[in-house]
Amino acid sequence: MSGCRYVKYGLLLLSMAAMAGVAHAGTIVSDDGVVIDATAMETGASVVPSSAGTGRGAIENLSAEGVMLASVPMSELLTYRPMTASVGIESILGFDSRVRVYTNRFPQRAIGLITFGTSRCTGWLIGANTVVTAGHCVAQGGSNRFYDRTTYRFYAGRNGSSSPYGVCTVKALWTSSTWLSTGNDQYDWGALKLNCTVGNTVGTFGFFYTGSSLLNEPTVISGYPGDKPLDQWQSVDKVRVNQTKRLFYKNDTIGGMSGSPVFSDRPPGAPYASNGVYAMGIHTYGVYNGLPFSTHNHATRIDQALFNNLISIRNQP
């Protein structure tokens, strides 16, 4: 965190005048008004390793970590609408290749259901209390306004009617100031800071960036689609179009999977990151007009700036 600059606004709605002074690609902002100029921060790293967590502990033990045990009834959760971006319908591309996965193992248990207001998304843990998701799952792009943090809940490893690792409330929402002020989809990413440390139990994803092409790298996407009853579903493909800030693939996705990790289980000796489960992007969009958008779903790619931003947020208390 050395070299980071902070500005305290203390408002949920950030004024246009305030955002004009801080909205550049390296700036990140929280819903309680903390602004970090991440351009002043260089980690010197390009990869963060994954951790499988302890995998132990009944829900009762997790309550000591701040996990909120009172759960919303499944019947009510099923009425929550999947949050989707303003463009791009998350899409089944031909045959539906999704398969149900179970959350009693890593990394599936490190992926969770996010609910807020009457909406839902997917998120994944990168730290004991840090969840990564899509930007449009924390704020409407271009609105300078976050959604109401007090309504957020995170269900790590949700499995149908079961919340095996409890329910966590949220103490901060984060995103890029560029997403918040302009809605530029290349900066569509977000993060939650939890009032619990459930990542110690369920495990945490590794993540990496590289300036090299990721073309043909395997892509696994696992999340909570709106057409399924709160089960976790997964699809496998590969990077088919590589861009600096976007990755395109034909993994099948449906609304509700926004924020899912785009990852692979990388063997020893693999380039860029090896011997663990690593994310390379955040699933955000489905098909819309114009190639390659009209024939692929796609992710916000983890580039060097986003990599540094995620580390900075993970290091927040």
State what each model feature region is:
Residues 12-13, 23:
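Cleavable N-terminal signal peptides
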Residues 19-25:
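Sec/Tat signal peptide C-region and signal peptidase I cleavage site
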Residues 25-126, 308, 312-316:
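Protease-domain processing segments flanking chymotrypsin-fold serine proteases, especially trypsin-like
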Residues 86-109, 113, 118-120, 139, ...:
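Conserved catalytic-core segment of clan PA serine endopeptidases
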Residues 106-153, 238-243, 266, 280, ...:
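Catalytic histidine site
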Residues 124, 252-283:
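Catalytic nucleophile loop of clan PA
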Residues 160, 170, 174, 185-257, ...:
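Chymotrypsin/trypsin-fold serine protease catalytic domain
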Residues 280-317:
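C-terminal cap/linker of serine protease catalytic domains
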